[in-house]
Amino acid sequence: MEKIRQVKTEEDVIHLLQVALEHEWAVSFEYVVHAYSMPKGRFLYEDPVLKQATDARAQTIQIGIDEMYHALQLGITLARLGVDPGFGTDEVVRHPLVGDNLRRDKMTEEMVTDLYQSAEIEPGAFPEIENMVWNISFDEVRHIAQFGAMIDAVEAAFGAGAAGYPPNPDREHRGDLRLLHGLNRLENEAMHRYLKYVMMFNAHQDLSQRLFKNSVNHMRHWDKLSGLLVRLGDVVAIENAVTDAAGVERSRLPMPAAYPGGNRLSALETLPDLERGLVAKYEEAVALDLPEEVRAQLRLHLALTREHVFTQDKLLANARRIKGVV
């Protein structure tokens, strides 16, 4: 990760935020991928902040959600500075061993904490941004302590060789897995496309909050689908990953790097068809011969996505109806 020590100008601030944003996008995805490679409830540790026994998988998911909110804060700040935040990411990596993933997570947090806390921002020049950076940095300090405790507990109980769930080698030959992976890709894209528009329209409280609600729904669907894949004997895929001889997966493009829409109308025009595409895929999925608990979860996703179709149709119609809305 690039080191940025002197931040004196607006250009310096933008560069700092862009470097940080690429990190935050990556880990908001990577930590959840690591979490769903762990068995639920198996890797317990004493959390140094929560002060109680905690499931490493559950807390790693929560840390990933923290990072998504960091990305949103950074992106909105960049948008207010007149800069397209972008969706480029640092490299996303998954190791076969749980301990290796957790060590990577802790190392990554240490690197980004150094980025935030060692950046010497010109005193008084950008006080709100400086305050945000320090606030985010102490979330990362907490994450370092939590990942460290996870590593110690996992290796004390299971040694260094505790393996995570591997990708299912038959996923390309199983229609159910292909369909759920396809849904996961669409949910990941939908979540980030909505976040792009939340950042674009951050000054429009009504629109941005409606879009943010849908983004959170898609994030939850992606999270639940990742759990369903484990239930069906697979793990969430890392898009565009290359796997080496040791089974380590790496990707620099775990999600689309660009999304359409440059103003309110052109952005809103993209969303009804996105939601209808998801509805069609969910309707296909609930018709499969799957365990009832899986189908029940998919039906919940389908119902909420139908609500999104209704909402996005009306948001688009209203944007077309009212003159002067930009």
Residue ranges and their predicted role:
Residues 1-326:
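Non-heme di-metal
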